[in-house]
Amino acid sequence: MRPLDAKKDHYRKMAREQGYRSRAAYKLKELNKAYRIIGAGFTVLDLGCAPGSWMQVAASAAGNRGTVLGVDLEYAEELNHAESMRGDVEDESLAETVAERLGRADAVICDLSPQVSGNWSVDHARQISLNYAAARIMGRVLAPKGNAVFKVFDGEYAAEFREHMGHMFSKTKSTKPQASRKQSSELYLVCLGFRG
């Protein structure tokens, strides 16, 4: 984003004013308001959690009786009712580590993005690959009837990923929150009612 655009970015300004770690908080707030992905008392797994704005929203939605565990390659500062750990979603052992630490989750939220190279085909394929890795972890920890949301770079492989997730959930819906930049190719795949 150009510096001039950043100054005009309404959500970035609001995030700073309201104490969120990034503008991404408003994406999850909007999605949760529309689809009730996270409710009071929920146990939530946040994959790709850094810098932690989704952890902030999840901890608020889950409330005092809820638990949030964030996982990322980078460190994300912990909050009340939200812990974080370093981990790579592509590491085969991470699912077991998360299951031991968290138990069953009521919701899995995933805002993963690769280091963007500028080559759209490569970046899109890499992001979808990360989603498949996250979905494997989700399959290990998400409780039956649980919910999930995944960032998806729209493109060649997005429909295949949506179809894959559609087999695991009662309902799936692709949507673009108002807080997403208009020029961004990102969509969010909301998945409700895990069939376990």
Swiss-Prot record:
EC code(s) of this entry: 2.1.1.166
GO cellular component: cytoplasm
Family membership noted in the UniProt record: Belongs to the class I-like SAM-binding methyltransferase superfamily. RNA methyltransferase RlmE family.
Domain of life of the organism encoding this protein: Archaea
PANTHER family: PRE-RRNA 2'-O-RIBOSE RNA METHYLTRANSFERASE FTSJ3 (PTHR10920:SF13), RIBOSOMAL RNA METHYLTRANSFERASE (PTHR10920)
Residues that hold S-adenosyl-L-methionine according to the record: G52, W54, D72, D88, D111
Active site: K151
Molecular function terms, GO-annotated: rRNA (uridine-2'-O-)-methyltransferase activity
Name of protein: Ribosomal RNA large subunit methyltransferase E
Chain's gene name: rlmE
Reaction equations catalysed: uridine(2552) in 23S rRNA + S-adenosyl-L-methionine = 2'-O-methyluridine(2552) in 23S rRNA + S-adenosyl-L-homocysteine + H(+)
Function summary: Specifically methylates the uridine in position 2552 of 23S rRNA at the 2'-O position of the ribose in the fully assembled 50S ribosomal subunit.
Subcellular location: Cytoplasm
Main location: cytoplasm
Organism: Cenarchaeum symbiosum (strain A)
Keywords on record: Cytoplasm, Methyltransferase, rRNA processing, S-adenosyl-L-methionine, Transferase
InterPro entries: RNA_methyltr_RlmE (IPR050082), RNA_MeTrfase_FtsJ_dom (IPR002877), rRNA-MeTfrase_E (IPR015507), SAM-dependent_MTases_sf (IPR029063)
